[in-house]
Amino acid sequence: MTWNPDQYHQFKDARSAPARDLQALIPERPYAQVVDLGCGTGEQTAQLAQRFPQATVLGLDSSAAMLAKAGAQQLPNLRFEQGDIQELSGSFDLLYSNAALQWLPDHPRLLARLWEHLRPGGVLAVQVPANHDHASHRLLTATANEFETELGGFTRFGTAHGASPVLTPAAYAELLDGLGAVDITALSKVYPVVLPGAEGLIEWTKGTALVPYLSRLDGADAARFLDVYRGKLQAEFPGERVYYAFTRVLFVATRPEL
């Protein structure tokens, strides 16, 4: 996927609010090795490095464009690498991921794999969007189905209905309990966002949900895709003001000491 950091940061304040809440849930401990999975442009990674100066903090992301921006974050205990979350190696005292794991399938299996990289006494802290039932996502999947040939049958989650892998807070809590976690917190929170009509929703989704689709289309097909999607949004949201219930799931858990 080809990420555009400037497009993503068009709504920086709104997108940053859940991250602040996630960081507030992280307990104060003498972490030695910290990793930010899907670190993007690195602002939150730098915040972790500043908060835990005794720790070596790694920001991991698959996007070269995002990491190019992250390079502006300069701290002695901070470094960035390009890589795949699913190929993570090493062990860590804090596994942190804000708005990244929703791109990966099969969260029960994913969390079990990540748990293996968490040291005894370590903390897992995750935030994922849970907006897959919102009209903007449903209409995006409907548009993708109309462009099945151009997209080679691709839908974001590999099914005709574009089903999200994101679970409920209760389901994450149960999964973590099954892994032996303690001090589990799992919650859902709505961050209200008001956007300027359907066009505002287009700009919002260009930063995230549209990326895997537009990355697979050439210029002409991408423009047609946007036009079809825009038409669906305008029919659903004909007014000049769209209230968007920006819903997030946050969970934090500790691996017991040996």
Swiss-Prot record:
<dbReference type="Pfam" id="PF13649">
    <property type="entry name" value="Methyltransf_25"/>
</dbReference>
<dbReference type="InterPro" id="IPR023506">
    <property type="entry name" value="Trans-aconitate_MeTrfase"/>
</dbReference>
<keyword id="KW-0949">S-adenosyl-L-methionine</keyword>
<dbReference type="InterPro" id="IPR023149">
    <property type="entry name" value="Trans_acon_MeTrfase_C"/>
</dbReference>
<keyword id="KW-0963">Cytoplasm</keyword>
<dbReference type="InterPro" id="IPR029063">
    <property type="entry name" value="SAM-dependent_MTases_sf"/>
</dbReference>
<comment type="similarity">
    <text>Belongs to the methyltransferase superfamily. Tam family.</text>
</comment>
<protein>
    <recommendedName>
        <fullName>Trans-aconitate 2-methyltransferase</fullName>
        <ecNumber>2.1.1.144</ecNumber>
    </recommendedName>
</protein>
<keyword id="KW-0808">Transferase</keyword>
<dbReference type="GO" id="GO:0030798">
    <property type="term" value="F:trans-aconitate 2-methyltransferase activity"/>
</dbReference>
<dbReference type="GO" id="GO:0032259">
    <property type="term" value="P:methylation"/>
</dbReference>
<dbReference type="GO" id="GO:0005737">
    <property type="term" value="C:cytoplasm"/>
</dbReference>
<comment type="function">
    <text>Catalyzes the S-adenosylmethionine monomethyl esterification of trans-aconitate.</text>
</comment>
<dbReference type="InterPro" id="IPR041698">
    <property type="entry name" value="Methyltransf_25"/>
</dbReference>
<keyword id="KW-0489">Methyltransferase</keyword>
